[in-house]
């Protein structure tokens, strides 16, 4: 029987920003459980929750897109043999807006985006239809095991 992957996790919320509803849904143990469910190898990850200004700046700087997006993943492993290391950046206002528009509980949407970002940190992508189908299938399976419905329905 294989052992569960180990996770070293650092959570960051922006200083001086009040995100009480978000923070209450995101205790470290909960975030760690969601991420671990999507890990296939040991990992060191930082998850930073940001406001729209920081989200937009990061998306513009690193992706050339001048808007805040829901999740950005910065994966630092240079080869498959390297440990999984990375930063997941979640933009709180965008996550909340999407959850409301999609009629999803905020916690369920955070779980989905954390699983999604964790898969990116491990090299998964959705640049073409086959990659997207594979990634969505893994996300749906992982979220189901965590008790969440299919995020794509």
Curated annotation (Swiss-Prot):
Which amino acid positions bind Zn(2+), per UniProt?
116, 120, 126
Instruction: List required co-factors.
Output: Zn(2+)
Q: Name one GO molecular function term.
A: zinc ion binding
* EC nos: 3.1.-.-
Q: How is the cofactor bound?
A: Binds 1 zinc ion.
Q: Name one GO cellular component term.
A: cytoplasm
Biological process (GO), any one: rRNA processing
- SUPFAM superfamilies in alphabetical order: Metalloproteases ('zincins'), catalytic domain (SSF55486)
Alphabetical keyword list? Cytoplasm, Endonuclease, Hydrolase, Metal-binding, Nuclease, Ribosome biogenesis, rRNA processing, Zinc
Instruction: Supply the InterPro entries for this chain.
Output: MetalPrtase_cat_dom_sf_prd, YbeY, YbeY_CS
Tell me the domain of life: Bacteria
The entry's localization annotation reads:
Cytoplasm
Which family is this protein grouped under? Answer: Belongs to the endoribonuclease YbeY family.
Which function does this protein serve?
Answer: Single strand-specific metallo-endoribonuclease involved in late-stage 70S ribosome quality control and in maturation of the 3' terminus of the 16S rRNA.
* Protein's name in the database: Endoribonuclease YbeY
